């Protein structure tokens, strides 16, 4: 028997020393962090470990629908492609959405699961980033300073389950790539310091920026500061070597960003063409104690502040760092100064803008707080790697106790904090004291390893549970139900009625998510994205569609005429969280080409108004600028009829409404044809619209109840004294026989006591009247959104 065969037959003994070898530290840290997060979600009963949905905020409204759409693209069941999305907004570009929301490499796991389980791979995106980021941080800490592999793995778990992850990052899978980008770029910067692997480092930077450029920019800035501190402290290197390393890092970062330029430039151009976000206002620096309270694990404050905690092991070592005498004073000062400067930069507006791409973000203004958590982990590792003495550890423990006492009563300090700080903190302190006194004893090291591992694992799990539970109690963080039985039934129904490309099947009515067309299929008007084109949003609004967030979330058109214009042959209607009804209608051609048609060509009355000098686009009495007129212009034919109104009675009727109260009645037919422009307060007839043959075939829509259309009264005269109506053509026309303003009792502003509109005999003549189109002379905008008014604006 040869020597090789004898070696092959020898049994392999797996020992503690083998398992704690440096090569096993990164996967050990990844498994520990992922296990702690899963345990926390199990305690909460959150999906996929319970029935509680985790689709909160944008996770349910954007990321789950976008991942479902990616599944459709991967399996060839979508009506569009990577360049264009025919499902949302009646057709919008998609490439920028893909490069922003779906470039996380873990997002492609969605193709391995059935469509109805698409929420599971979205959870795996978060879980995978936690594991990979923790493993890479373990490697990066080893490059900062040599030391025990399993100890730095435990500290890396604090980074992977830090407050930013469980509070902010878990709800935005695209941000979770920042957890991976920071140690990736840190490793590349370390190679620059040692003048190695420029090409590999460039690729790491490119991967970080391609995955998510927003958080990668934060990580790049943070690691540039870390590299600057390391170069400043590397006094053993000649100055020319340090300058060369700095130049090497700059060229590496620039080249890596250029590699990701196709993704960055596409999203930048799409952002410029999109609806602007609502202006966010930074409300100033939070109280200092509220910021410091965020260092204590287990709580989530109601005061907006950076989420910072990294677990009790990391916090205790950060507190002990200034007292570790084995570390030179200048090193302690440099690292503490860096952390303090970064913390201050988060609450000072100029530097806050620098961290967030020169714009105050909507929502949390502290999205870069994972950067400070990483710096705290680095400081804790430097303290632990220099083997702090018992007295130094005790000083750190006193500092933590003082911090907890000062922050008592702050919103970020909850019941979980008082479980973790004294309970987990005592175990961690005892383990570190034993390690400091009996480091040479193997049995002591095994006991300390087990105690610290359990403390870190259970503490991280409990912190994730408590913070997520506290966050979900906030009203606008309430979980949504995305892919339940009702949603799957709606998807099957849409697939059965699909008639694309002959006509559209509108999934409406925004029942399950803000991106129902992506979630359920079909071709609707709902679309919620940072890249919603400005022209698309305005066009849909001018046709009567509603929007949220100042146009960053559009809704499907609900009027039959608007649906006909968009070629919708099947649609779903129903109240929120109520039964969903399916409607059908004959659809106009999906695409129609016809010569341009002027607004004055639609009816004789508008031509006459234009001849008299009245702006037919803005005057509501003519209707040229109303939703109804725009629909007629697109159809190229008359659809609505404005009834003739005449005054009856003296306007002194009761308050019960009707002609007696308002002094109005309808002359001519007793019902309105269509649901055209009419005065408020008139009876609302059923809608019956017949579209003429040119340019579409005849379309008969069923009688449907039609809500009050948006047809606002003109504003009163800006002079404020003459009780006249502003005509929009350079003056006001007071009513004949109008008395002084004080003589009015129950009349509406701008009307006579009889409730009539002003006459047309005399002008006010006041020089203070602003010209048409000015802020004071402009009539109120037409409201839309289900015809009854704009939906509430979200944040």
Feature annotation, model-predicted:
Residues 337, 341, 359, 365-483:
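Contiguous transmembrane helix-bundle modules in multi-pass membrane proteins
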Residues 1-46, 248, 437:
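Start-transfer (signal-anchor) and selected internal transmembrane alpha helices
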Residues 26-29, 147-154, 190-201, 249, ...:
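Membrane-interfacial loop-to-transmembrane alpha-helix junctions, especially the N-terminal start
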Residues 37-137, 157-179, 286-293, 347-351:
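Membrane-interface coil-to-helix junctions
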Residues 23-59, 252-265, 343:
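Transmembrane signal-anchor helices characteristic of membrane glycosylation enzymes that use polyprenol
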Residues 130-144, 150-234, 245-267, 403-404:
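Membrane-embedded helix bundles of polyisoprenyl
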Residues 455-691, 695, 702, 712, ...:
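Soluble catalytic regions of membrane-associated enzymes that act on cell-envelope
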Residues 61-62, 245-248, 252-334, 341-342, ...:
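Periplasmic/ER-lumenal interhelical loops and adjacent helix-loop junctions
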